[in-house]
Amino acid sequence: LGDVYKRQIQNAYNLLNRTFEVGGSEIAHREDVGLLAYSPIAQGYLSGKYQNGALPKGSRKELFDRLQRYEGPYAEEAIQAYLDIGTKYNIDPSQLANQFVTSKPFVTSNIIGATNMDQLKLAVTSIEVNLTEEIYSDIEKAFQKHGNVAS
């Protein structure tokens, strides 16, 4: 992970919500503050489990009915773009999302929210995923097209 920081800030940060990159990361670097990034897979949306209106039994969305942050008018299209990148490079979408967050130099800790052992294994092994320049380029193209879709 990134440098060792004595002070931390905790913000949501993921492929769909990169607002911290604009200003926040610069100020944090200047003030020697690291980012504890939470919601790296966007409340599960970047795993693909909620695509096309799916509502898996036992999921947080089903249990608590309060996960609308990533359901704005352009969110599903943006999510699909990142899922397609994972498919293109044969990378599990959760691992792609987690490693994207972990790879950022301003991130000192990636706060995962695994609710079962399979999710935990995917999160922990995401560190082994090599995000090449080509993958980062595809991620940036998707971000340029869709931007921050968290509401």
Which residue ranges define each predicted feature?
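Glycine-rich, positively charged active-site loop/lid region within alpha/beta enzyme cores that binds
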Residues: 26-85
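Conserved short secondary-structure transition element at the edge of the structured enzyme core
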Residues: 71-128
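C-terminal amphipathic alpha-helical "assembly" element
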Residues: 102-103, 117-144, 148-151
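Structural preference for beta-strand elements that scaffold enzyme active sites
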Residues: 6-10, 34-36, 108-111
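Glycine-rich beta-alpha junction loops
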Residues: 13-17, 39-46, 100, 116
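Short, small-residue-biased leader/transition segments that mark boundaries at the very start
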Residues: 1-5
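Conserved, mostly hydrophobic/aromatic
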Residues: 9, 28, 35-38, 82, ...
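Alpha-helical segments flanking ligand/cofactor-binding loops in enzyme cores
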Residues: 22-26, 99
